[in-house]
Amino acid sequence: MSHSACPKPATARHSQALTGEIRIPGDKSISHRSFMFGGLASGKTRITGLLEGEDVINTGRAMQAMGARIRKEGDVWIINGVGNGCLLQPEAPLDFGNAGTGARLTMGLVGTYDMKTSFIGDASLSKRPMGRVLNPLREMGVQVEAAEGDRMPLTLIGPRTANPIAYRVPMASAQVKSAVLLAGLNTPGVTTVIEPVMTRDHTEKMLQGFGADLTVETDKDGVRHIRIVGQGKLTGQTIDVPGDPSSTAFPLVAALLVEGSDVTIRNVLMNPTRTGLILTLQEMGADIEIIDPRLAGGEDVADLRVKASKLKGVVVPPERAPSMIDEYPVLAIAASFAEGETVMDGLDELRVKESDRLAAVARGLEANGVDCTEGEMSLTVRGRPGGKGLGGGTVGTHLDHRIAMSFLVMGLASEKPVTVDDSTMIATSFPEFMGMMAGLGAKIAESGAE
């Protein structure tokens, strides 16, 4: 399904208080991995709360193409997995659409199989660098035929038997770490990932839950050493996917910015590797109450009650970036309404997301009257409390769902409306966004649907 075929602009207007209670769709990271590990494990995996966005569904289709049986009964997804080491060579290229996570993790998963697997994606995914995942796979004996710059479309030709490696991850990337660990599942011996900066750890937690022989040690310098023993048995599990903190960010920031708002968000994943945004907003003065913190399936979960707040600018520590990398666009929106200056640094990973997300945010802010400075790896925003004089612009989304949702949130609190040039790709991560926001009282309409 091509997003570029028929763009749907949307406009958000100044709204009255947002009120109500919502439950956010399932976490995208955990949903991708649930399909992958369920498809790989022996026996049956049952999943509730799965995020049914296009990206995750594409991962499910890829697992089906390699032998997993996946069906939905009511609200439950049921997977009959093939067993570790038993994936089949797909007959056609695996199409991941817009899904960088699905593509990169699956490259790791299948790379060490003695078979040939081809990967394709949409225009946005085909621009994104895959070398970061392909380089460790090459060390394990995988041959790669790729478009220029290690981009898709690409084909992996696996070795007869893969070599286990010890790999030091050169950037803070959960996808690279995960790809190497998944490659280790079908590799004899011990595969080790050395991670200097901790990133989201869903792969480690979930693989242990499925029965993989995986250990994590942190040395005296805080460097994590993750070891996986290959060719072990994985067994199907029951998974209830908690709400995605990256999707939670949009209604959460909207509730902070729209005067008089009071919104409760249920069942949000509070894994410490994912809560950088909440911490930062609290430092800015946000009224966010964490209710009933609990454990579900080995993950921290809580409900959040969010009330409209007067925010002040802060300096965000660069080392916090891995725990909120997807939330900077909507943080920049919050900063636009804060008193004073907000400085965000260490944002180099944003340059290689669905779009050059840093540039896209800066252009969008400028188009809507925000005083901001874009650096090589940084963004500084000087806010206007109350959103006075903000809005009135149209934002280029560059096929990026998070840019689209962030600027629609902006329009709810700015003086003048904000338009995004396309809203179709919101369906990749948060298909319910428009309806859920409208239910809270947000004025968002697709253009032509006024």
UniProtKB/Swiss-Prot annotation:
What EC identifiers does the entry list?
A: 2.5.1.19
Query: Would you tell me the Gene Ontology cellular component terms?
Result: cytoplasm
Catalysed transformations (reactions) = 3-phosphoshikimate + phosphoenolpyruvate = 5-O-(1-carboxyvinyl)-3-phosphoshikimate + phosphate
Q: PROSITE patterns from the entry?
A: EPSP_SYNTHASE_1, EPSP_SYNTHASE_2
- InterPro entries in the cross-refs: Enolpyruvate_Tfrase_dom (IPR001986), Enolpyruvate_Tfrase_sf (IPR036968), EPSP_synthase (IPR006264), EPSP_synthase_CS (IPR023193), RNA3'P_cycl/enolpyr_Trfase_a/b (IPR013792)
Named in its record, the pathway it takes part in is:
Metabolic intermediate biosynthesis; chorismate biosynthesis; chorismate from D-erythrose 4-phosphate and phosphoenolpyruvate: step 6/7
A Gene Ontology biological process noted in the UniProt record is: amino acid biosynthetic process
Positions binding phosphoenolpyruvate in this chain are K28, G100, R128, Q175, R357, R402
- Main location class: cytoplasm
- Residue positions annotated to bind 3-phosphoshikimate are K28, S29, R33, S173, Q175, D326, K353
Q: Which molecular function terms from Gene Ontology are attached?
A: 3-phosphoshikimate 1-carboxyvinyltransferase activity
Which terms are listed as keywords in the entry?
Amino-acid biosynthesis, Aromatic amino acid biosynthesis, Cytoplasm, Transferase
**SUPFAM superfamilies xrefs:** EPT/RTPC-like
Q: Which family does it belong to?
A: Belongs to the EPSP synthase family.
Q: What does this protein do?
A: Catalyzes the transfer of the enolpyruvyl moiety of phosphoenolpyruvate (PEP) to the 5-hydroxyl of shikimate-3-phosphate (S3P) to produce enolpyruvyl shikimate-3-phosphate and inorganic phosphate.
Assembly behavior: Monomer.
- HAMAP family hit by this protein: EPSP_synth
Task: Identify this protein by name.
Answer: 3-phosphoshikimate 1-carboxyvinyltransferase
| Source taxonomy | Bacteria, Pseudomonadati, Pseudomonadota, Alphaproteobacteria, Hyphomicrobiales
